[in-house]
Amino acid sequence: MSELTLGQAAKLAEEYAARGLAKELASLRAAWDDEVEAAARHADYRVRSQAYRALAQFRYRQKLELLRRGLDDESPGVRGSALIALEALSRDHPGDVNKFRSLLHEMAARDANVAVRRLAIVCLKNGTPLPDTIRLLEGIAGNDEDDAEVRRTARSVATLLVKRSRAK
């Protein structure tokens, strides 16, 4: 697999997943496991960002603890990539969001980077529609001092979660 870069291998993994080639995806995943781990710990934030994006492309659901490192990273770009990966991995697995709910709440409410805040809010849509999450999002949506896009995203996700909670 050394003839491929991590980005190319991740793109190939995404293609395998889209085509339902589970055996090929598993083989590629096994071959790139160590490289993804090493990239997630790299000194360069761009390499770390690529590693966290690759977690979703490779469908590495067993690497949620590694994903936590990305959510706690000093770089907003890395945190954003980790959030994008979490959103993708949690679409069919709300438990993934639930594992990180308190951290996502903190990021949605207080992260210094507006894009990271919005991505954290978007991740919350895939979780269980709990009242504390809905209250947090409604509070963000109603805060005129917050960024307009953050408020709009929070309002949209809160509305979706309320609908889902009533459908149960």
Predicted regions and their residues:
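Structural detector for internal amphipathic alpha-helices that build alpha-solenoid repeat scaffolds
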Residues: 3-28, 46-60, 69, 80-94, ...
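Amphipathic alpha-helical scaffolding segments comprising HEAT/armadillo-like alpha-solenoid repeats
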Residues: 25-39, 60-72, 92-108, 130-142, ...
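Short inter-helical turns and helix N-cap capping residues of alpha-solenoid HEAT/ARM repeat scaffolds
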Residues: 43-44, 74-75, 112-113, 145-147
